[in-house]
Curated annotation (Swiss-Prot):
Coiled coil: none
GO cellular component, one term: ribonucleoprotein complex
This protein's record includes keyword Ribonucleoprotein: yes
Alphabetized UniProt keyword annotations: Ribonucleoprotein, Ribosomal protein, RNA-binding, rRNA-binding
InterPro entries (alphabetical): bL21-like (IPR028909), bL21-like_sf (IPR036164), Ribosomal_bL21 (IPR001787), Ribosomal_bL21_CS (IPR018258)
Keyword Oxidoreductase belongs to the record: no
Disulfide feature: none
GO biological process: translation
Organism: Cupriavidus necator (strain ATCC 17699 / DSM 428 / KCTC 22496 / NCIMB 10442 / H16 / Stanier 337) (Ralstonia eutropha)
SUPFAM superfamilies cross-referenced by the UniProt entry: L21p-like
Similarity comment: Belongs to the bacterial ribosomal protein bL21 family.
Signal peptide limits: none
One Pfam assignment: Ribosomal_L21p
Protein name: Large ribosomal subunit protein bL21
Length: 103
């Protein structure tokens, strides 16, 4: 069984037992959270799509860790004008383990 969930402005296809890195969720390590925005649920040939959400469906997950992704380097330059601008960015993430899909 799998589900398509929306969190942090992105959509993820998940199944029970998988690990998943999502945008940061303010929760303690080891806490169990519920993802309520389920867009689709499927098992084998049967797929149930929501309009826009599947009513009564949710995904239970446990927070494994909180961290930061690798640095992304931004470099802007204007040729022949001696203009250079450097910037770096590290995005925070939350790693989840999907425990169960309730449909």
């Amino acid at each position: 069984m799998y589900a398509v969930v929306k969190t942090g402005g992105k959509q993820y296809k998940v199944a029970a037992g998988e690990k998943l890195k999502v945008e940061q969720i303010p929760a303690d390590i080891g806490a169990e959270i519920t993802l309520d925005q389920v867009l689709a649920v499927g098992a084998g040939d049967q797929i149930k799509f929501g309009t826009p959400l599947v009513s009564g469906a949710s995904v239970k997950a446990t927070v494994i860790s909180q961290g930061r992704h690798d640095k992304v380097k931004i470099f802007k330059m204007r040729r022949r004008k001696h203009y250079q601008k450097r910037q770096g960015h590290r995005q925070n993430y939350t790693e989840l383990r999907i425990e169960a899909i309730v449909a």
